[in-house]
Amino acid sequence: VHLTGEEKSTVSALWGKVNVEEIGGEALGRLLVVYPWTQRFFDSFGDLSSPSAVFGNAKVKSHGKKVLDSFSNGMQHLDNLKGTFAKLSELHCDKLHVDPENFRLLGNVLVVVLARNFGKEFTPQVQAAYQKVVAGVATALAHKYH
């Protein structure tokens, strides 16, 4: 993903304020509620039958944090997202058989959650930079599929 120096500092500055547990749980929860077909990858998570069940589910929160911990690692390696996410791409492709479109959906949901949590601080310029990052991460995660 090509980010200018200014875009890199913009995304890094905001990311430094992100509570990965809180934001991760909300992002994964929203993905599961807004795109319910994604729930099939989380059969072991128990009750995902309603929005309140999803958002109250400890496994959703825990996995959301895990997802954002990986995303945080990617934020440290914006110039090498394919290399950073190579093993996760392989896992999601070969073992979990996740539709790569879901990575794009999760990235867009993450942008919504960041906007919701950071309000006025999440300017159109910040959003534009984050859209590039989540698109780059989605492409890197889908890399093994090609």
From Swiss-Prot:
Known tissue expression: Red blood cells.
Sorted UniProt keywords: Acetylation, Heme, Iron, Metal-binding, Oxygen transport, Phosphoprotein, S-nitrosylation, Transport
Residue numbers carrying N6-acetyllysine: 59, 82, 144
GO cellular component: blood microparticle; haptoglobin-hemoglobin complex; hemoglobin complex
Gene3D superfamilies: Globins
PTM annotation (N-acetylvaline): residues: 1
Transcription regulation in keyword set: no
Pfam families, per database record: Globin
Annotated positions of the Phosphoserine modification: 44
Modified residues (S-nitrosocysteine): 93
This protein's record includes keyword Lipoprotein: no
InterPro entries tied to this protein: Globin, Globin-like_sf, Globin/Proto, Hemoglobin_b, Hemoglobin_oxygen_transport
Subunit note: Heterotetramer of two alpha chains and two beta chains.
Function: Involved in oxygen transport from the lung to the various peripheral tissues.
Protein family (similarity comment): Belongs to the globin family.
Descriptive protein name: Hemoglobin subunit beta
Gene behind the chain: HBB
